[in-house]
């Protein structure tokens, strides 16, 4: 059986009511240039911070940005909430629940 570990700062709720409380936060480090005269700066993304080593039978729920970085690093044990799926439930413009996860 697969164990899900939520490494986002939010409780993730599936459409069936299953909830995954936050168990920590994985993120991608970043650095910024100074703002130009138009108020625009450049961002450079770095390493993933807060993502544990791979564990057999564990999938880590992470943000889409962390998922992208993890995939680029060869990780296959990360998923992100399917916030763009047509079955995602929204109320007043906010996501209430998702139908599942994307890899």
Over which residues does each language-model region extend?
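Intrinsically disordered, low-complexity segments enriched in small/polar residues
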Residues: 2-3, 7-11, 15-103
């Amino acid at each position: 059986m697969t164990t899900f570990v939520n490494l986002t700062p939010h409780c993730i709720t599936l459409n069936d009511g299953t909830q995954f409380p936050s168990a920590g936060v994985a993120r991608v480090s970043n650095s910024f240039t100074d703002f130009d005269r138009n108020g625009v700066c450049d961002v450079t993304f770095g390493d993933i911070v807060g993502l544990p080593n791979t564990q057999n039978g564990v999938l880590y729920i992470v943000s889409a940005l962390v998922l992208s970085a993890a995939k680029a690093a060869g990780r296959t044990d990360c998923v992100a909430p399917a916030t763009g799926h047509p079955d995602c439930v929204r109320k007043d413009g906010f996501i209430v629940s998702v139908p599942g996860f994307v890899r």
